[in-house]
Structure formats: C-alpha cells, structure tokens
Amino acid sequence: MIQTIINEPTPLVSNSSPIVFDNTDIRTRCAFCSNGGWLDYQDGNPIFKIFGNGYTGYYNVNFSASVSSAMAGVVAIGLYEDGILIPDTVRAVTLAAADDYETISFNKKLRVCPRGTSSYVIASVPSVPTPTTPTTPITTQIPIITNATFNISRTNN
C-alpha cells in the first residue's frame, strides 16, 4: 500500500495539470519496485506506475481533496490510465465564488494484466459536459488542491 498527501494549498499550473503529491506518509515494503514490488513512485512525480509482475493484479485506488480556485466556476479532477481519462473517476464541483472550497473524492478498482504495466496520474480535467446539454462542454477553472490524500492498495481478487 502507498498513501501520498498534500497538506498546503497547491495551485495547479493549468486546468489540465497533473496533481503532484509532495509527501508519502505510508508505504509498505511490497510497494517498492526495487524490492520486486508492484509500484514505482517517487515523491514530487505525478506518475504512479503499477507492474503486473507475472500475475493479474487488482488494486483499489482512493482519492480525496479539498479543491478551490482563484475564480468562480467548475473544477474537475479525474484519474488517467496511460494518458486516457477513466470516465467514471471524473468528479466536478461548482464553486460559487473564488476561494470557496468543496470536497472531491473517488474510489476505483483497477486491474493490471500479468505482463502489463500501467501508469496512473490524477489531474485536473479541462472540460466537463453541461448537465442540461451534454454535447456542450464547460471549460473548467484552474484548481487549487489542499488536504489531499491518494492511496493505492493491492487486493487479492
């Protein structure tokens, strides 16, 4: 298992930037790739790389953060696998005013093939569908992330 955190307010560079976690507060021994483990990750790098290591692996990922923005509007966060947004991980909130805070969270079960390697990044999503007219996208605001936690744990099934 690994758990990474962000404590201080961290503005992202754009509305499509990855979230860079600056501190790992829990990391079990099997979550080190140098020990034949299943995860390659370093603090300050947005990419979490999971290795299949010869057997099918199932992983639970959980993300939670307080989000804000310098402007009112929609902020959206999602999980990307090998550069592709996983649709059911997108979470969007509407901030009524600049510097308002809302909580965004998701959990997802992932499968990595036995000989596969997958890279995961949590990032801001640049646009989301308008609820009443889904074909018309809403451009999102640049998020400010604080009190964020992201963890990945390997499961047995």
Question: Model regions: which residues?
Answer:
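Extracellular jelly-roll beta-sandwich "head" domains, especially the C-terminal globular C1q domain
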Residues: 1-157
